[in-house]
Amino acid sequence: MFLHGYLSCKETFAKQVDYFSRFYRVTAINFLGFGGSVSLSSPFSVSDYAAWTRQVFALLGLEKPHVIAHSFGCRVAIKMAAQDKELFDKILLTGAAGVILKRSLGYKIKVRTYRFVRRFAPKFAERKFGSVEYKTLSPVMKESYKKIVNEDLRGDAQKIENPVLIVQGRGDCTTPIAEARAYLQNLKKGTLVEMNGGHFAFMDDSLTFNLIAEEFFYGGTRIESSI
């Protein structure tokens, strides 16, 4: 099962789908609001996306699949696994989002400035201080984005019983190694592997990533399965 990142789509996993579908049953979905999927009618939190994804599992008849999740998809996978240890078998996270580290003084000043300016010139504040991805969102998606990025999932990670592998791109500046290590400290059965690449390490070096994933899931032994 593949769960994509924010402002992304299932097609980002094209090389993984192509590789694994030769030997295993593979499922990749687009979250609501992304990749041509239906738009959100109300702001979704991580829990809302987790509940929606569970409904997709039921509709597709998925039973305890392995999961590969990227960035925002990691948030959803972590939330789901924390709620029910039987949903997944093994979990692979890459570019894992969902950890809020201690904010720097510069960040705090920027936030306070933004809040002050927003009181008098909200549109200017959004243009000046909003992130690149935030600026592209619809009003509903902006409210959803706020809910998502302001939730720290380390508490959920502590509840996960499944084996978890975090594959971290050494050049990832979006979700840096400190966040991966923070997750690792809160996982009961967690392992961290670093590889060359950035936030999209699974695309930067797909073959290495695929081999790491296959070794984690199957120990290098392929089990034939219908597609």
Regions found by a protein language model. Name each.
Residues R75-Q83, F88-F120:
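Flexible "cap/lid" loop of the alpha/beta hydrolase fold
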Residues C173-E179:
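Conserved alpha/beta-hydrolase "acid-adjacent" motif
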